[in-house]
């Protein structure tokens, strides 16, 4: 059976890496690893969504990041909208752990990470 980034518990050998990346006017520090989506950088599609997302302030409620991976989209939106809770879900246990660690490393508290 092959491993994919949507595998619950990747068997791929862990090879963590960290880097910084600017999103929405802030320099974020990310930790990523083998077995997660776009492990070496924030991919073009995610960057585009992050930079163009605009929240309708008239609509109440939380923000949901489905397939959060190591967290770049959810964390950038949590930073941009600190009054909102960002709920982040993923099937990949390694990715969820990284998302939690990245939230802590970037001092972002208005997020919760769940298994989907």
Language model regions located:
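Conserved SAM-binding loop and adjacent beta-strand
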Residues: 33-51
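Residue-level signal for pocket-adjacent positions within structured domains
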Residues: 16, 31-32, 113
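Conserved SAM/SAH cofactor-binding pocket of Class I
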Residues: 46-116
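Short, flexible coil/turn micro-motifs enriched in small/turn-prone residues
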Residues: 20, 30, 40, 62-64
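Short glycine/serine/threonine-biased micro-segments
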Residues: 23, 33, 43, 65-69
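N-terminal auxiliary segments of SAM/dcSAM-dependent transferases
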Residues: 1-24, 35
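Generic, low-specificity signal for short hydrophobic/alpha-helical stretches with a mild N-terminal bias
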Residues: 3, 31-32, 59
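Well-ordered beta-strand scaffold positions
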Residues: 26-28
């Amino acid at each position: 059976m092959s491993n994919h980034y949507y595998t619950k518990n990747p068997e791929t050998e862990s090879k963590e890496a960290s880097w910084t990346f600017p999103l929405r006017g802030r320099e974020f520090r990310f930790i990523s690893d083998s077995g997660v989506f776009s492990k070496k950088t924030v991919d073009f599609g995610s960057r585009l969504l992050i930079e163009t997302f605009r929240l309708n302030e008239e609509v109440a409620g939380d923000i949901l990041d489905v397939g959060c991976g190591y967290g770049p989209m959810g964390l950038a939106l949590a930073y941009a909208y600190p009054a909102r809770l960002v709920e982040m879900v993923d099937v990949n246990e390694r990715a969820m752990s990284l998302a939690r660690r990245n939230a802590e490393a970037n001092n972002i508290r208005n997020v919760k990470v769940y298994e989907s």
